[in-house]
Regions:
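Internal helix-loop-helix
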Residues: 49-119
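Glycine-rich, Trp-frequent "lid" loop and neighboring beta-strands that shape
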Residues: 63-64, 83, 106-156
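Short, conserved alpha-helical segments within structured domains
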Residues: 39-40, 91
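N-terminal glycine-rich anion-binding loops that anchor highly charged ligand groups
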Residues: 16-24, 42-49
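Buried hydrophobic positions in well-ordered alpha/beta secondary-structure cores of metabolic enzymes
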Residues: 11, 22, 51, 58, ...
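Intrinsic disorder at enzyme termini
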Residues: 1-10, 142
């Protein structure tokens, strides 16, 4: 076994808190969430209050401005308890960065703080009847007409 040198003492403290959260808030509820088909909103709010959502998001948008190693810690602790359906990493590491890098300032100010707090949950809606989740096969279009966008396509 080799010693990991990637993480600092701050990461270790964060890991301890993340581990406690996963063991007390996630693990006991996993089976129920699986049966009901969704994760309770309450755990998202608790995760946001604990700083476990969008940790690398800049502070001006509600995040901690932390480095990506904090996200790595969260993912490791989630998988340590055997969970893959929580959705925090999709929310924080895929959806939020899209908004951060490609959204207008209005979009960033409106949605990112709510995503960091757990008030809003990010998701990706990318499937179509003929394409499934193959992004290359998606036929939906968005065309700007004046001040508006016209969307054409179908959703599964």
């Amino acid at each position: 076994m080799f010693e990991r040198t990637l993480f600092t003492e701050e990461h270790t403290l964060f890991r301890d808190a993340a581990r406690r959260f996963m063991e007390t808030e996630v693990q006991p509820n996993r089976e129920r969430w699986e049966e009901q088909g969704y994760v309770d909103r309450e755990v998202w709010l608790k995760a946001g209050a604990a700083g476990f959502l969008c940790p690398s998001m800049p502070e001006q948008y509600g995040g901690a401005g932390a480095d990506k190693r904090y996200s790595t810690v969260l993912i490791e602790e989630q998988y340590r308890i055997g969970d893959s359906g929580l959705g925090f990493s999709l929310h924080s590491e895929i959806v939020a960065p899209y908004l951060l890098h490609y959204g207008s300032e209005h979009i960033k100010q409106t949605y990112l703080p709510k995503m960091a707090s757990g008030e809003m949950i990010g998701a990706i809606a990318m499937t179509e009847p003929a394409a499934g989740s193959d992004l290359q096969g998606i036929k939906t279009t968005a065309v700007k007409q004046g001040a508006h966008w016209v969307l054409n396509g179908s959703k599964t």
